[in-house]
Amino acid sequence: MGARASVLSGGKLDSWEKIRLRPGGRKKYKLKHIVWASRELGRFALNRDLLETAEGCVQIMKQLQPALTGTEELRSLFNTVATLYCVHQKIEVKDTKEAPEEVEKIQKNSQQEIQQAAKNEGNSNPVSQNYPIVQNAQGQMIHQAISPWTLNAWVKVVEEKAFSPEVIPMFSALSEGATPQDLNTMLNTVGGHQAAMQMLKDTINDEAAEWDRIHPQQAGPIPPGQIREPSGSDIAGTTSTLQEQIRWMTSNPPIPVGEIYKRWIILGLNKIVRMYSPVSILDIRQGPKEPFRDYVDRFFKTLRAEQATQEVKGWMTDTLLVQNANPDCKTILRALGPGATLEEMMTACQGVGGPSHKARVLAEAMSQASGAAAAAIMMQKSNFKGPRRIIKCFNCGKEGHLARNCRAPRKKGCWKCGKEGHQMKECTERQANFLGKIWPSNKGRPGNFLQNRTEPTAPPAESFGFGEEIAPSPKQEPKEKELYPLTSLKSLFGSDP
């Protein structure tokens, strides 16, 4: 900690510890904040020793300036370095908020001085600030190397996303205004995916050969004061120097070798993305339970990888987005009409596939099923052509109503036989057994018992005869025939014992 905190000593350290972290706050800067800043610089591949001087702080702020829209930690690092710069320059600031404001004022004043110096030298053109090629105070076009932050961001995108469709716009944004040398630096930082990089090199070589075919080199010596025309390998940065690239890009008329080379790289990246994303836009279909928003995200992600013109992509969006939706969303989208915007589609299909939509669909299905079942029951009742049941009152004996609704005086006793002492459910009058015979019978025992059989009063005599058969009585046989009709047990089970 002591080695990293040695950037300040004596009066500078006292001034550092008087600056507040927030406007009106109690906490102030300490040595630990310098230690934290040095650690963060290591993450961005910047030299920690730059914190020891004001010029080093300026160089750090130039590298961090394009990334101020990043994370909170990155903004805190920039503000800490700006505060440290004010301490080195002995600029009095009360808190962290005043330090970036002072740095911004100094930058504006320096730019005005550079422009004024250029005008005094007879150059009426404004100073070019097109990064990475800028014009210095002497009017010379100089190149600023690509920042480590840009390279780090590009490497992270390739590592995390591989070669998904969003890599192409990220590369285009990070390489804005870059020279062929800067573009080659970005490509060389990619460690893995060498098969993809070889495909990219093949595409670049093909485009360079096509450029040489369309733009043949001028024969003979080049007139003095003119620059040679770039070849395909010059545009790719293999046979041209950085100064030649700057002259081509800043000449009048300019030859944008950086933009041409960038188009070649993007063309190769499109081929790689198509290889890494083999799914066709025709195969993107919404699942039965997939939310419409997730389906749209997958659709447009695959659409970005398609090699087609903007008109064709517009037709795909208008046609396939609705055609490949699930039946629920397709019904809603077709009801909106062909001129519906994506926002209207997203709003109309919001909630389709979610719990509330599932519950609503289930309730509708159950109501339809119950309605169909009720209709079937009514049809069965209406089509039933059996004998109509006659309702008869047990109290008065009339038809058309039940006994509980009868207005006549309540009859005493059994409603079936008229006798008192028991109820109708206990009445045995004219009760038939399972053979259909009225029970109790006036002829004695019920029909399902043996008739005219004397009950033994003592155990039967022991019989020691084997194989003896008892001959049936010839006199009893006709009586049994009379007692047992066709519905008797004898007719069902054969001879009774």
Curated annotation (Swiss-Prot):
The biased composition feature labelled Polar residues covers: 108-126
A single Pfam family it belongs to is Gag_p24_C
Record keywords, A-Z: AIDS, Capsid protein, Host cell membrane, Host cytoplasm, Host endosome, Host membrane, Host nucleus, Host-virus interaction, Lipoprotein, Membrane, Metal-binding, Methylation, Myristate, Phosphoprotein, Repeat, RNA-binding, Viral budding, Viral budding via the host ESCRT complexes, Viral nucleoprotein, Viral release from host cell, Virion, Zinc, Zinc-finger
Q: Which residues carry this modification: Phosphoserine?
A: 147
**Bilayer-spanning residue ranges:** none
- InterPro entries membership: Gag_p24_C (IPR045345), Gag_p6 (IPR014817), Lentvrl_matrix_N (IPR000071), Matrix_HIV/RSV_N (IPR012344), Primate_lentivir_Gag_pol-like (IPR050195), Retrov_capsid_C (IPR008916), Retrov_capsid_N (IPR008919), Retrovr_matrix (IPR010999)
Ranges for region Interaction with host CALM1: 8-43
Tell me where the sequence motif LYPX(n)L motif sits in this chain. 483-492
UniProt GO molecular function: RNA binding; structural molecule activity; zinc ion binding
The keyword Coiled coil is assigned to this record? no
Q: What residue spans carry the region label Interaction with membrane phosphatidylinositol 4,5-bisphosphate and RNA? A: 14-33
Keyword flag Phosphoprotein: yes
Name assigned to this protein:
Gag polyprotein
